[in-house]
Amino acid sequence: ARMGAVCVDFDLYGYGESEQEVGREAHRTDRAHVYQAACALKLLDYLWNHRHDIDRSRIGANGGSGGGSHTILLTVLDDRITAAAPTVNLASHFDGGCPCESGRPIHLAGGGTCNPELIAMFAPRPLQIVSDGGDWTASVPTLEYPYLRRIYGFYGAQDKVENVHLPAERHDYGPNKRQANYDFFARVFDLDRTMIDETKVTIEPSRMMETGLER
């Protein structure tokens, strides 16, 4: 947001204030997958139709781990996304460790697919895959990324897909992964690079983010 973007986030199903409504156990269900996807689409509808400070030509999606899975799903469901950066989730052999991100899983439908095939449908729009050496994304530089470059190559757009691989890191959304995504969206959306420094960010207390549900 400090770089000039309007940023939107929401509670996962069964997490945060949502836990007060449906219980934490509801998160590890396939309905969480559907609900979270619907929330993302409705929030995008709101931004698209009611916010006059939104540039419709610059709509990005980003998330880590299960959020990366939903980033991929959102690019499949909605053509309004113009750049995406799924982080520490992409693998051809693993669809996610929770029903909240994989459904029943959806990857078994219609003869079967995988997340790299799903995100390949995003071509030729700008795409960055962030991976590391300590989880299932370790294969991205040698398997999933070459596959995506081949797909993007059919559009003459191999320069639109990139991979930031951090071989010494593990499964998290740490500072190096965040910085990689800041840089990606700054380049693609022409954001203010001088505001990338996280040390100037104020972390608001959680109560400031609540809508008012009783604890």
Cite the ranges covered by each PLM segment.
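Cap/lid segment of the alpha/beta-hydrolase catalytic domain
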Residues: 1-50, 56, 90-100
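Loop/turn elements at helix/coil->beta-strand transitions in domains of secreted/extracellular proteins
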Residues: 3-6, 55-58, 79-83, 124-127, ...
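An acidic- and aromatic-residue-enriched active-site/binding cleft used to recognize and process polar
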Residues: 12-15, 64-67, 77, 86-90, ...
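Alpha-helix capping and helix-loop boundary segments enriched in small/acidic/polar residues
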Residues: 27-38, 61-72, 105-118, 132-139, ...
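Primarily recognizes the serine-hydrolase "nucleophile elbow" in alpha/beta-hydrolase
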Residues: 45-111
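The feature captures the conserved acid-bearing segment of alpha/beta-hydrolase catalytic domains
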Residues: 83, 95-150
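Alpha/beta-hydrolase-fold serine-hydrolase catalytic core, especially in secreted/extracellular enzymes
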Residues: 123, 130-215
